[in-house]
Amino acid sequence: MRLLNKFLIQVGSKYRPEELLNVNNKRFTETVDVSLPRDMMVYNGLYLGQDKRWFTPSSLLLQKLAQEDATKKAYVERDAAWLFVVGKDIFEENVQRFQGDVKLGSYCLVMFGEGCIGYGRFETSGDRRVIKNMFDVGDFLRRE
């Protein structure tokens, strides 16, 4: 719960899930009432993400956060979006516009059109400013 809340604060979200359930190796979900015993559950509700060394959000959570106006966002064009989805970082000059208070060291959602394709940390790399890829939707494809 602590890592999830920290992530939500970092991206500027006002969303705070109320009922959380820890099932299957620290995967958080918004719970749904079911009559199964807890030890027999595999999933229950909307998958929000997983605790590792930091919180790794699900693509469903990222899409939910993308609908909020307060969330920090960086909008990119098609070529930069493709590079981000295959695991590359985005240079600041490839960002069309920022929404919200995106400063060096802060986290933001990376948007292509109205869809969120991941999130990253806005930082410097050498003499350039980049959005370092922390998670993208291509992660699921690379795992297979």
Q: Model-derived features: where do they sit?
A:
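Polybasic, low-complexity RNA-engagement segments
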Residues: M1-E144
